[in-house]
Amino acid sequence: MLHGRFVAYSPTSLQMVDGQPTRADPASIRADLQVLRPHFDGLITYGSVNGAQAIPAIAASLGFRAVIIGVWDPYDPSQLDAAIGAARANPDIVTGISLGNELVFSKRHSFTDLAALAVSVRRRLPAIAVSTTEPFHMFYGSEAAVLLHQMDFMLVNVHPVFQPWFRRAPDHNAAEFVVNVVTKLTDVYCGPILVKEVGVPTAPPEGGFTPERQASFFAELLTQFPPARERSFAYFAAFDAPWRAFDEIADPAHASSAVMHPEEAHWGLFDERRRPKPAVARVPMLEGAPR
């Protein structure tokens, strides 16, 4: 974490249409990663199927240093097996596996469930670091201890934009919030901490979200939170995903309770056509990276 730089990545060609995933094709994944490589050498993914299982091998061919494979539903044997297969096939680049994203927060599983799963996965992948991801506040309580004891490193989501003061606060305060959260997490966890999700959407402007705000926030965060051996952050996210504003509404199973969130479409440092936003110019180029 000290010398590299991670970005949270979902393939631009992997989308949800009427509640069903499309398939990410290798050529599109390669095009995505070629755009990212000058600024990033680490990837954190969210899924292990529908074409995403090809990400580690393509990343390795482009000189990426590390991939943390995400498993969207680690209780689906096909998804977990695909992730484990990709990790075994690419041992030089796959450094970690993330078992789900906010599963406890969404009340789909418990800390105890995930702790047992981590033990099981570690038996199958003894050389790979095992983690899961929750919003930061979920790890503060004593009930999280059973899971924390089984995590080789912590992945955590820290979003200042969800705080009621964010829209009126300067970037200094938003970045300081992230630093303070990570410092508090060290009271409950002694291992490496990687903030998986932290960022600012670039629209809609009426919500206080603009490309300029995204750029200035990341610049301030990098100043206050420089990478260290035991603590760092990943840029969230690589690319815009316009479908994310509508995917719950498009899924009949969730249509009755879904709420539109237009900002969810605009987290990317690049738009859905891989065009850079202003924030990219303020992310330093990596030494030795292709240009």
Task: Pin down the residues of each PLM region.
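Substrate-binding cleft of extracellular glycoside hydrolase catalytic domains
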Residues: 54-137
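N-terminal carbohydrate-binding/catalytic regions of secreted carbohydrate-active enzymes
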Residues: 2-82, 86
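Acidic-and-aromatic substrate-binding clefts and catalytic sites of carbohydrate-active enzymes
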Residues: 42-54, 72-80, 105-106, 137-141, ...
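Aromatic-lined carbohydrate-recognition surfaces of secreted/lumenal glycan-active proteins
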Residues: 71, 122-141, 190-199, 203, ...
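Active-site clefts of carbohydrate-active enzymes
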Residues: 158-166, 187-218, 237-250
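Aromatic- and acid-rich polysaccharide-binding/catalytic face
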Residues: 94-95, 101, 134-176, 192-201
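Hydrophobic faces of well-ordered beta-strands that scaffold small-molecule active sites
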Residues: 5-9, 41-45, 66-70, 95-99, ...
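Aromatic-rich peripheral "rim/lid" segments of glycoside hydrolase catalytic domains that contact
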Residues: 1, 5-8, 12-21, 206-212, ...
